[in-house]
């Protein structure tokens, strides 16, 4: 079936005059212009190995968690759970792990545990078993 041209024009005017609800932003124009968090959307990030996909996604997840109190379930089959936790800790503190005091690690990891759940990758799970 073909798109109804009248409806298409109406949608374009809705976009032009900001009548379409926007996803959550980070208040960074250079990011928000291209990427917003939309609840219920399913996004996939693909690319060659060792190009920074996981790092970028974790950074964005941390930024959205800090700004909007979002919570995440992370499955990353190519990365260990402790390497994910380390990146999250370093992103949250802005400090390499070797320079973070133990007491701060304890506090920050409580917050991280509240906002990020990591799926162990030592075996495969069904969607039902994760719920």
What does each of the following model-derived ranges do?
Residues 1-39, 110-113:
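Core recognition of P-loop NTPase motor domains used across DNA-transaction enzymes
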Residues 13-20, 41-44, 86-90, 94:
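Short, mixed-charge, low-aromatic patches
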Residues 32, 67-131:
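Cytosolic-facing regulatory segments adjacent to core modules
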């Amino acid at each position: 079936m073909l798109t109804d041209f009248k409806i298409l024009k109406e949608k374009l005017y809705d976009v032009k005059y900001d009548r379409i609800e926007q996803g959550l932003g980070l208040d960074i124009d250079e990011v928000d212009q291209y990427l917003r968090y939309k609840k219920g959307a399913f996004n996939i990030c693909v690319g060659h190995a060792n190009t920074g996909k996981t790092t970028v996604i974790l950074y964005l997840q941390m930024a959205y968690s800090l700004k909007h109190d979002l919570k995440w379930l992370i499955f990353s089959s190519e990365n260990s759970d402790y390497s994910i936790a380390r990146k999250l800790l370093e992103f949250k503190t802005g400090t390499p792990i070797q320079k973070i005091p133990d007491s701060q690690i304890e506090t920050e990891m409580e917050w991280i545990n509240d906002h990020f759940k990591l799926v162990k990758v030592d075996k495969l799970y069904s969607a039902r078993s994760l719920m």
